[in-house]
A protein has these predicted regions:
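P-loop (Walker A) phosphate-binding loop of NTP-binding proteins
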Residues: 13
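Hydrophobic anchor at the beta1->P-loop junction of P-loop NTPases
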Residues: 10, 106
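ATP-dependent small-molecule kinase phosphotransfer cores
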Residues: 37-103
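Post-Walker A helix-loop "phosphate-sensing" segment adjacent to the P-loop in P-loop NTPases
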Residues: 27-35
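Extreme N-terminal, non-catalytic leader segments
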Residues: 1-7
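Conserved lysine of the Walker
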Residues: 18
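Hydrophobic positions on the alpha1 helix immediately C-terminal to the Walker A/P-loop
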Residues: 21
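Small-molecule kinase domains that catalyze NTP-dependent phosphoryl transfer to phosphate-bearing small molecules
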Residues: 116, 120-121, 125-180
């Protein structure tokens, strides 16, 4: 059975609207949309073992970025977590005989090398969410600083209203699933 899965790597400066865009798409697709970040497992480890308070200030962003780098270098943990998450979800969809139904996995990833690896190994589509004021903000780590140092398949301008972003989410879903 052919899979209807689209893996979409989403990137953008902190505060650019990545999660808002993904949630708008999820509102339209329901259970056929999942979201995972390459730092989700890193955050779980930081919460449980490093007593991280869950705040996303500059110091915490640097800590999480460094921890992700260590886990990536040690055993490719963040990438393998995304692959495992995708495989488990696809198995669930297959169990209900809906694997061929259009479905989307949004993956938040910042590092250009990792983004290109998702494209190469998983056939992912890449999206950059752009918001002018977010791109001018100070960054505390290499991942946030290198957001614009990558070529993306699609760019979504998020300098308008939430309704504007919702319309762009509709357009994007129609485009990637070839709906006219």
């Amino acid at each position: 059975m052919e899979s209807g899965l689209k893996i979409v790597i989403v990137n953008g400066a902190p505060g650019s609207g990545k999660t808002s865009f993904e949630e708008l798409c999820q509102d339209k697709m329901g259970d056929y949309c999942q979201m995972r970040s390459t730092v989700d497992l890193v955050k779980e480890i930081a919460l449980i073992y490093a007593n991280w308070d869950g705040k996303k200030d500059l110091k915490s962003r640097k800590f999480l970025s460094d921890l992700k780098d260590l886990l990536s270098q040690f055993n490719d943990v963040p990438f393998r977590d995304i692959v495992r998450f995708k495989d488990v979800w696809e198995d669930e969809l297959d169990m209900y005989n809906v694997k061929e139904h259009p479905h989307i996995l949004f993956v938040d990833s910042r590092e250009p090398e990792e983004i290109m690896r998702f494209k190469r190994e998983l056939g992912a589509i890449t999206v950059l969410i752009r918001r002018s004021d977010a791109e001018m903000a100070k960054t505390s780590n290499h991942a946030d600083a290198n957001v614009l140092n990558c070529e993306y398949d699609y760019e979504i301008d998020n300098n308008g209203s939430l309704d504007d972003l919702s319309a762009k989410a509709d357009e994007f879903l129609n485009l990637i699933f070839d709906k006219n």
